[in-house]
């Protein structure tokens, strides 16, 4: 079984940037890329069927946009990939997927600059970094797009217990 690299994907520029970096890593390490989109509706007791249905329709639209964005980013990369949809808490869903696939790492996008100053990479990235036992890469987008040729870049935190692509 080919090892995989899990990347969280929504309809944001940050996740597209993270996906592009994940594709580079997957190609270099010979990993299968698993693009995970997580549908999340916070439900409260006051929500009725009339408010839940429009929220679900909006999630369908966001999912379609995320899938289309993934196809656009990965077209022509030569990377073996799949698009997977899960429901629930995004951080938890990404960690479960990584465990299920014995993934080499999880890659997510992070908010640029202001979040870095506060010490947070975004709620999903921060939750994964604090709770996941494996490798995590948070790629910051915005004005400081990652340049693999430079020693510096927007990577906020990478926690590798072993080299990406190495056997367990």
Residue ranges and their predicted role:
Residues 109-110, 136-140:
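Short beta-strand elements of ligand-binding domains
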Residues 39-106, 117, 142-168:
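Charged, low-complexity cytosolic intrinsically disordered regulatory segments
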Residues 15, 63, 121-125:
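Short, conserved glycine- and acidic-residue-centered signature motifs
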Residues 33, 81-82, 136:
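Hydrophobic anchor at the start of a short beta-strand
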Residues 2-49, 131-132, 155-168:
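Small/aliphatic-rich secondary-structure junction motif
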Residues 105-131, 145-148:
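Glycine-rich, Arg-bearing micro-motifs that act as flexible, cationic patches
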